Amino acid sequence: MDVKHAKLIAAMTEYDKGDPKRIQHFMKVHDYAATIGTLEGLDAKTQDILESAAILHDIGIHISEQKYGSCNGKYQEIEGPEEARKLMTQMKNFTEEETERICFLIGHHHTYNSIEGIDYQILVEADFLVNLYEDRCSEHAISSACKHIFRTGAGIRLLKQMFDHNGYKTSSHREDD
């Protein structure tokens, strides 16, 4: 791991201090995003943006809970970008272009109908890999995610490796396997 992402993880851990569930979640999403991005052969700039967005993707949860009494994904998309912008500005090692793309990804990571860019696709897949497990989703939900959400070869392989051995039939719902 590079120093920039290690420092971002430290800052986000401080931001989520006392909330191990959220810290565990973003760490797992980061690791899956980093893995998928590497296996998909992303260029260094896109990989950097992806990993930063994965670390920060749920930064809007606490403020959403305070403002709306809910951590619903749409509220996270509303509140997250500004919180992320503040944290990245304090760190002083993000360009304006990086900040804008990371904020865009955070502001759309629960919107699945118009995914634009490989970084966006991989962030969504990484978050799904973690959420499908953490939320103990049904076989139907996992199969549906495989069919409708996952597009990268690496993401599909990880999903199948994670869930097919448990009796879930993700592969039978993909036409392009």
Descriptions of predicted regions:
Residues 47-69, 80, 103-110, 127:
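His-Asp-centered metal-binding catalytic motifs of divalent-metal-dependent phosphohydrolases/nucleases
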Residues 41-52, 92-106, 119:
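Acidic/histidine metal-binding catalytic segments
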Residues 2, 17-27, 31-43, 56, ...:
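Divalent metal-dependent phosphate-bond-processing catalytic cores, especially two-metal-ion Mg2+/Mn2+ enzymes
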Residues 29-32, 36, 74-91:
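An active-site-proximal "capping" alpha-helix that borders the catalytic cofactor pocket
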Residues 4-28, 60-70:
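Active-site flanking loop/helix segments enriched in acidic
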